[in-house]
Amino acid sequence: MGAWIALNQFKYFKNQIKGFIGIGSAPEFLERLMWKKFPKKVKKEIKLKGISHIKNGDYEYPITYQIIKDGRKNKVFSKKINSKIIVTMFHGQKDEAVPVSFSRKVLSVFTKAKKRMVVIKNGDHSLSNKLSINKILKELDRFRNTIL
């Protein structure tokens, strides 16, 4: 959800934002990865009760109708960001939560940016292994040296 929130910040802070790094980004996931895949029974429950508890692995998550509606009000894929900044997207090739196509779609939102896509071969959604973290830290250094 972090990249989604950050992309929406361009509405207010476009001139202050100097770079963008996304990690396993999933803007609009509420609609595209959840709502569209929910069975009709779950959608009906969410609409009628305002909430449903969705089990995923060992966890249960409350999904409210309000958050689905809020997600619809904050779409970013249909907008363009014309900032001349550096943008790097990191995504794990073995991410089972979010398809790599989401990070590629985020790149397409930036029309004038210097863009880079880094797909980490054995990376999962968290990109929390040592190799992934080192690649991200190296990119942060590059940003710091380029932007500051």
Predicted features by range, described:
Residues 1-4, 25:
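N-terminal glycine-rich phosphate/adenylate-binding segment common to multiple enzyme folds
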Residues 3-14, 20:
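Short glycine-enriched nucleophile-adjacent loop
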